[in-house]
A protein has these predicted regions:
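Catalytic center-proximal scaffold of phosphoryl-transfer enzymes
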Residues: 1-312
Length: 313
């Protein structure tokens, strides 16, 4: 409330509800702190230095952590929104990567599409984590992934990442001297070029022609790469070579490998999910690990929000 000294008019305004003390940090300070530590992956000590050197404002690591906790709590409604957004999407990308929490092996799980990103940390890589996320058990769309078998229990259809196939085929060619793998790599890249030129999807005639060539390469590959080949001088049953494992997988999941040429929304790769989790690897290179599961959950929720906000701008 303020009274004008000249005319005597009294002006009143609503007191900010977030202000509860005589002196406290404003939202701009909190937002900047959270963005630097969680968005830009800057360690707490360096965030302290930034505020001290640039703003002449002392912030302790404990205060920075409290700001992150507050951001986590305020984003609880967003957490439900992103899960609903993921469930509505006809296509989602999934991936997971190792995470060090308190010196123990854990996992960061990612589910994302062109609009929404959801990260979640868990000690389990498989079903326990998927169940706790409360998304995939109810999902009915297409899942794009890197052939992690647990995902095959969810979604209605699947699409496999051909970037991974290309790398595996190159290994077969270079290390196992397989010719079929060279031909398969060339075919997959050729199909991808054709899909791009066609605007995202091939007609049924072209699909059929490519499927025949795909099957022929695999059939010839079986002669070149037999099951459990005998190794001279070695007794007992020999392990099946990696090249044959790959061949069998490409045959068994042909529909999922080639789905990108049949469904326009399905991409050639799972690169979207891989890009999403890349910053987690950067965080661990900078900071080493997460001290607690709570810290990992804060990181995941804030990163989910930042990634989603950038996509819907």
């Amino acid at each position: 409330m303020k009274e004008c000294a000249k005319c005597g008019a009294v002006t009143t305004g609503a007191y900010p509800t977030e202000v509860s003390k005589a002196v406290q940090y404003g939202n701009s300070v909190k937002v900047l702190s959270v963005y630097l530590s969680q968005g830009q992956l800057i360690p707490y000590k360096r965030v302290e230095e930034f505020f001290k050197d640039e703003l002449n404002m002392p912030l302790s690591s404990g205060t920075i952590y409290k700001f992150n906790q507050e951001a986590f709590e305020r984003l609880s409604s967003f957490d439900e929104q992103v899960k609903e957004g993921v469930l509505r999407s006809p296509l989602n990308h999934t991936d997971e990567t190792g995470l060090n929490i308190g010196g123990k092996r854990s996992w960061l799980h990612s589910i994302s599409n062109e609009t929404w990103t959801l990260f979640y940390p868990h000690t389990s890589r498989g079903k326990d984590a998927i169940a706790e996320m409360r998304v995939l058990p109810s999902y009915k769309g297409i899942l794009c992934h890197d052939y992690y078998k647990a995902y095959y229990e969810y979604g209605s259809l699947h699409a496999l990442c051909n970037s991974h196939h290309i790398r595996e085929l190159e290994r077969c060619t270079e290390q196992d001297n397989q010719n079929w793998s060279k031909l398969m790599k060339e075919l997959l890249l050729e199909i991808n070029e054709a899909v791009i030129k066609a605007g995202g999807k091939l007609d049924e005639l072209e699909q059929g022609e490519y499927q025949i060539r795909y099957g022929t390469i695999l059939s010839n590959g079986k002669d070149e790469c037999p099951l459990n080949p005998k190794i001279p001088g070695k007794r007992g049953k020999t392990a099946q070579p990696k090249s044959r494992n790959l061949l069998d997988r490409l045959e068994r999941h042909q529909e999922d490998v080639l789905r990108f040429m049949k469904v326009s929304i399905v991409p050639f790769t799972n690169n979207l999910a891989e890009r999403d989790i890349r910053m987690t690897k950067v965080h661990q290179k900078i900071s080493g690990c997460f001290r607690s599961l709570e810290g990992a959950k804060i990181f995941c929720r804030v990163r989910s929000y930042i990634s989603t906000a950038k996509r819907i701008q």
